[in-house]
């Protein structure tokens, strides 16, 4: 599980670098906020198209191959981005990231975790996975911010040079950990060969039809969708703080990285709550409390 956590945790910091360095990205790549949003929209579309086949792919190929491909692919795409290419090439990079962090990663990551976890501890293991990923991402983001601040303030390379150093750091970490994960997972029981009695393409379509007609899956999808809408709002926090409140790039990064350190705690708590409490009522309370109007109303009543 630790290898899965570290492996997946090295991928997302550079893919979602916007949450800490939005203003610096706009300046370095000479693009507008709308163009950066277009890149992330492309990323979301690729995710939509690849999440479903990623599950099928994880049944056909070993986890270590898929995750290693994801890490090395993400790393080299990051090195390409560090050259500050034209906007058209940046969009190609985000398409590539959609493949390396969606198609080849997600299904393998979920399958690997579910195989490791005992039946009565699934929630706990997935909570540890999310918490561990959050810890790795927060740690890498903190180091990335330190690298950015060092090159900006001590070396004096300017915003573009400092962000380039951060991108190189993220890319090399993902590439460097690839052989460790690849060889360490070689003896894992997750690498069992595919079942020779598994059904072919006709069975795949029957399974897909069964999934699409399951109401619980659609309800779970709606819950995830709502949760991600709240999650995506936080991605614009860096740009808001820098453009509206006129905070420096380093100060903004410190605030957004501090938010990332809350994720490990939340992941662990969510996993244990999933094992010991009723999940649906608890999700309802969380979604309601996350609504900004609910928070403002509560604050208003409290002040009265």
Which positions does each model-derived feature cover?
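Cytoplasmic membrane-interface "Motif A"-like loop-to-helix N-cap segments
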Residues: 60-71, 275-288
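Intracellular juxtamembrane helix-capping segments at the cytosolic ends
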Residues: 104-118, 304
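Helix-to-loop junctions at the C-terminal end of transmembrane segments
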Residues: 50-62, 266-279
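Conserved MFS/SLC helix-loop-helix module at the cytosolic interface between two early adjacent transmembrane helices
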Residues: 49-87
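Glycine-rich segments within core transmembrane alpha-helices of 12-TM secondary carriers
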Residues: 126-149
